[in-house]
Swiss-Prot record:
Protein name per UniProt: ATP synthase epsilon chain, chloroplastic
Organism: Picea abies (Norway spruce)
Function: Produces ATP from ADP in the presence of a proton gradient across the membrane.
Keyword Chloroplast: yes
Topology of the protein relative to the lipid bilayer: Peripheral membrane protein
Signal peptide start-end: none
GO terms under cellular component: chloroplast thylakoid membrane; proton-transporting ATP synthase complex
Keyword terms of this UniProt record: ATP synthesis, CF(1), Chloroplast, Hydrogen ion transport, Ion transport, Membrane, Plastid, Thylakoid, Transport
Cell compartments where the protein resides: Plastid, Chloroplast thylakoid membrane
Gene: atpE
Subunit structure: F-type ATPases have 2 components, CF(1) - the catalytic core - and CF(0) - the membrane proton channel. CF(1) has five subunits: alpha(3), beta(3), gamma(1), delta(1), epsilon(1). CF(0) has three main subunits: a, b and c.
SUPFAM superfamilies, alphabetized: Epsilon subunit of F1F0-ATP synthase N-terminal domain
Molecular function per GO: ATP binding; proton-transporting ATP synthase activity, rotational mechanism
Length: 137
């Protein structure tokens, strides 16, 4: 049995195919979804989603949103998302370094919150790359 997974952002379809299993980061923790999962609507946190296809895992950095699970169909509506294969490691490392520095020099509560969210997004992109298996040539 499989699940139909669709990941949508406001401007594009990021993923639309059959999968065996997903592990999703929600605001109340991670949940694993297999076929015949109970119906559910959940807030999606900034975090990594793991996707299992025929014995291989893929990852995706999700930047918050909502997920609906119903009758083996999973629809994830996100602010933005990137597949592990689309993330440039050097650029992600540089973004993380800049976000960390911005948080260290943030002045005031608003700047600190914005810098913390930027750091969480940057960390998620790095985690999506490191959580995916190496690509063999």
């Amino acid at each position: 049995m499989t699940l139909n997974l669709r990941v949508l952002s406001p401007n594009r379809v990021i993923w639309d195919s059959e999968v065996k299993e997903i592990i999703l980061s929600t605001n109340s923790g991670q949940i694993g979804v297999l076929p015949n999962h109970a119906s559910l609507v959940a807030a999606v946190d900034i975090g990594v989603m793991k996707i299992r296809l025929n014995g291989q895992w893929s990852t995706m950095a999700l930047m918050g949103g909502f997920a609906k699970i119903d009758n083996d169909r999973i629809t994830v509506l996100v602010n933005n998302a990137e597949r592990d294969v689309d993330i440039d490691l050097k650029e992600a490392q540089e973004t993380f370094k800049v976000a960390k520095a911005d948080l260290a020099r943030a002045e005031g509560k608003r700047q600190a919150i914005e810098a913390d969210v930027a750091l969480k997004r940057a960390r998620t992109r790095l985690e999506a790359i490191s959580a995916s298996p190496p690509v063999s040539n």
